[in-house]
Each structure stands twice: as C-alpha cells, then as structure tokens.
UniProtKB/Swiss-Prot annotation:
Keywords: Cytoplasm, Cytoplasmic vesicle, ER-Golgi transport, Golgi apparatus, Membrane, Protein transport, Transport. This is Coatomer subunit zeta-2. It is found in: Cytoplasm; Golgi apparatus membrane; Cytoplasmic vesicle, COPI-coated vesicle membrane. Pfam families: Clat_adaptor_s (PF01217). GO terms for biological process: intra-Golgi vesicle-mediated transport; intracellular protein transport; retrograde vesicle-mediated transport, Golgi to endoplasmic reticulum. It comes from Oryza sativa subsp. japonica (Rice). Its main location: cytoplasm.
Amino acid sequence: MGEFSKESCPSVKNILLLDSEGKRVAVKYFSDDWSSNASKLAFEKSVFTKTLKTNARSEAEITLFDGYIVVYKFVQDLHFFVTAGDDENELIIANVLQGFSDSVGLLLRGDVEKRTALENLDLILLCIDEIVDGGIILETDANTIAGKVATNAVDGSAPFSEQTISQALATAREHLARSLLK
C-alpha cells in the first residue's frame, strides 16, 4: 500500500455561517492562513461584503477571493460559506457547502434562520465536525451528516430523517425529563 498523504485529499480552509449582517453564527477554521482572531474577523467581513449583492438563494455561487475559492449560499437570514485553496476542485467544495446547508436544514427541521440556529448551535457545530476534520473532507451527504449528529441527541430507534413530529416531540420530552431528574 502507498503512503497516505494529507495533501492528496481535498481540503477546506474554513466553514462559515454568518447572519444577514455578516456577524458570526458558527465558524470553524482549519488553516493557519488567518493567524489572529482579528484577521479571521476581517476575512469574514470582506467575504460577506463581496458576496452580499449576489443572488445565491436558489443555488450555490462560486467566487475567487484573495487567492481562495469561496463557495456560498444564502438561506433565509443565514449565509453559508466554505473556503478552500485555489488549487482545490470547485465541485467538491460546492458539495461540502451543499452537504452543510442541507444537513443544517434537516437538523433544524426546515426552520433555517438565525434564531433557530443559535438555539441549536451545538448541532450545527457537530455538523461541521462530521463534515470536516482538520480541513480534510469526511462526508458531504446531508442525510448521513444529520443522522450522525442526531444519534448524539436522539435515542436512535429510528433514523433522524424518518422520525415523525410526534416521535421527535416524544424524544424531546424524554430528554427534558432526564435532564430534570439529574
């Protein structure tokens, strides 16, 4: 067998979820390209400003920005971004973005807006962790991602995507009861 090389795997530099004003909802950086928090915030502000006037509501858009490929999509009042080096395959990065936005949609049960995202921030951060580890892309299928994240929050008797609302409410009641009994 040949040696595994991190350079041979598609990778991303960061995954950003910003609100409609460009403020952070959930972000994760996998690269030292932005060494300080100030440089990260400056990058987020500039990429948000550059993409603000585009119409990325129905489909993801791809742009080259400061030597990086940035794939982005807007859903309600949330702006999803995935950044990669300019040597990465745009279609793979677009698949990462699609997997991220779709899995967030599944986990938030279609209520993809800032308030709901902040209330379920733990699920969104777990979602990012299931998609990318150390910059290496692990998974892009939204159902698989949401299923893995949901197994941490759901009893696992049924796949997350197949649960009915009554099952979800029952599960939520169980978790609430358990937390109150602790």
